[in-house]
Amino acid sequence: MSSTLKIVVLGSTSGQGRGVVRALLSHPSLAHYQVVGLTRNVDGSPAKALLDAHQNSGDRLHLISADVYDRESLLEAFKGAYGVFAVTSDNIPGKRMETEDDLKHQLEAGENIVAAAKEAAIEHFVYTSLPDITKASGGKYSKVFHFDFKAQIEEMARRELKSATALLPGLYCVMPSSRAL
């Protein structure tokens, strides 16, 4: 293993991923990490804003185009990485989500991420999860699909990967001012 470790951050241009990128690049004790941010559009304004915000980080930040619904793009991005920070979303831009079937795309994304991480032999996988509300409530609340699907992805990661850490930030509201880098 080289002295520089590659960490791949999914969702690098959105709230959680952007915060992870910022944390990895801002602390001197983490200078041995090279950060690879994944985004669907490396030429988009969020990607450019991320690069601009971290232009003083030297060559430690690179952006790569990848999509959670394209397992091969994830595998290519994960090659040679030590760790992955993964987040899945319950929404698809421009599409209204109302039913369980509408939200199953999140499971597909999670399956792709975990499978690519396994194939790339990722040493440590960090995933933002949520509790399984159906299980926690003893079945009383059984239609909180976003939570339950994230919990299923977490279980899959723990079962399939060498080392997995789950962060449970809870459900939160994103305020317009939090979009700033």
Regions from the language model: what does each represent?
Residues K79-P93:
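Rossmann-like NAD(P)-binding element
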Residues K48, Q55-G83:
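Conserved Rossmann-fold cofactor-binding substructure of NAD(P)-dependent oxidoreductases
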Residues Q106, G110:
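Aromatic "clamp/platform" in nucleotide-sugar-dependent glycosyltransferases that forms part
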Residues S2-Q34, L38-A53, Y69-E72, D90-H105, ...:
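Oxidoreductase cofactor-interface core, primarily capturing Rossmann-like NAD(P)-dependent enzymes
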